[in-house]
Design a protein with these regions (language model features):
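Conserved, mostly hydrophobic/aromatic
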Residues: 3, 25, 48, 87, ...
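Glycine-rich, aromatic-flanked loop segments that form ligand/cofactor-binding clefts
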Residues: 88-124
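Metal- or metallocofactor-binding catalytic centers and their adjacent structured scaffolds
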Residues: 21-98
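Metal-dependent enolase-superfamily TIM-barrel catalytic cores that perform enediolate-based chemistry
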Residues: 114-227
Length: 237
């Protein structure tokens, strides 16, 4: 089996999908992250597709290396990895269809019957009270965890940050038995991240996500070493 063509389609102007077609008539479908979909389209069509055409999509590890090699001229992160991720998903979809197996079986099989989920707020324009009311609405629907996005990404230690006020209001609204997760998308210096983290510990926050920009791994390590709260990161790498 060989890859015969690749399509990149943006649905409703926001949702990018890739379709990998093969010479045996089987198609794999993958989804890309929605940020700057037209940039990703160029990467997929101009860089990644030539690296895949005519090759066996079932050899997913080799095809991943082909794509990574094709994208070496670009910096880590961004559109190159968004494109690679979507195409990798599509090739796994193909593999599952060919073998007539769900992907989880190809990745080692089922290890649990269910996975806990949390509600997530992507809005950063809510007042602390509005965020608290939103969190409560999800708790009333049965969620036992709520993740809020706060601070001002791209502006380190911005004075408009309301993280602590917001988490305080959310904790008051949902009580002590609900997990609160906080994601600031790299908006703090090391020193300020530690200050904020200690306050989040006092508020019983479940985890503190991306206190430092993704490229500052030493700084992230310093924050993690100074705090007891679990530090989450890695989605931007």
């Amino acid at each position: 089996m060989k890859i015969s063509s690749i399509e990149y389609v943006v649905l409703e102007g926001l949702h990018p999908f890739v379709f990998i077609h093969t010479d045996e008539g089987i198609t794999g479908i993958g989804e890309c992250f929605r940020r700057q979909p037209l940039v990703t389209k160029t990467v997929v069509e101009e860089l990644l597709t030539p690296a895949l055409l005519g090759k066996d999509p079932v050899d997913t590890e080799a095809r991943f290396r082909d794509m990574a090699t094709a994208g070496q001229a670009l910096e880590i992160g961004g559109a190159i990895w968004i494109g690679i991720a979507g195409l990798d998903i599509a090739m796994w979809d193909l593999k599952g269809k060919i073998l007539n197996l769900p992907i989880y079986k190809l990745l080692g099989g089922k290890v649990r019957e269910s996975v806990p989920v949390y509600a997530s707020s992507m809005a950063r324009n809510l007042t602390p009270l509005q965020e608290a009311n939103r969190a409560l609405s999800f708790v009333e629907k049965g969620y036992t965890g709520y993740k809020l996005h706060s601070a001002v990404p791209g502006k380190i230690d911005d004075s408009a940050d309301q993280t602590i006020d917001t988490v305080t209001e959310v904790r008051k609204a949902v009580g002590d038995d609900i997990d609160i997760l906080v994601d600031v998308n790299g908006a703090y210096s090391v020193h300020h991240a530690i200050e904020i983290g200690k306050q989040l510990e006092e508020l019983g926050v479940f985890h503190f996500e991306e206190p430092r920009p993704h490229y500052d791994l030493p700084g992230l390590a310093n924050v993690a070493e100074a705090l007891d709260i679990p530090i989450a990161s890695g989605e931007m790498i």
